[in-house]
Amino acid sequence: MSRTFIVSSIVAASIASVTFADKKEPHADIWVTALGGSLVTGGWDHITGEVIAPSLRVFEGELGLDPLFPFSGDEPGIGSDLVGTTLTMNLLQGISVWNGSGYTASPYSTLASYAGQDASSIAGGSFSFLVSQGLDLHPEYTLLGNGGADPVNGIYLVSFTVGAPGYATSDTFWAVLNLNESEEAHGAATAWVEANLVPAPAALVPMMLAFLTSGRSRTRRQSTRAAC
């Protein structure tokens, strides 16, 4: 298989994944799989079981849909094809709040809870689970105000990685959690993260071109030596 074909395929797949994500599927849960010895995230539809975005690092969730739990929600969920592997979701320290044009640090905190394990954004924390066939796990995400006070409405950004024995830890991915703000605002806040925090696949193109150029240069040098 030629070097040109391999690189072209990588670039095409990267661009296709962004195009797919830009279609704004109604909802994507977190899909955890492995690629080249590292954990990676994509988007999947937990209803159909279909992976709808092979590469995705920004996810959405709604808080307060259940009036009994006005500051909590269970989206995004998590699925994986790594059956038999214990995954650890790492909630990173600190959260941010959407200000209409970007994010600023928030004094609030977030809990991500599953099976009696509470990961807090105050100092960073984690929870673990075993991947079983057909896994459809939905942690509880809870927004906490200061000093026991209720948090105010807003759109909040939390950061995660996922790890597992035998694999390199994933790149950071994000959940954009909406507490009683409009879907338009939620969409804008999500789009900002996609545009500003996630490396664009277009950034791969110069590296791929350099890779191709170096290959052609080596080929020319080898051809010249052979002719001599």
Task: Locate the predicted segments by residue.
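Sec/Tat signal peptide C-region and signal peptidase I cleavage site
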Residues: 17-21
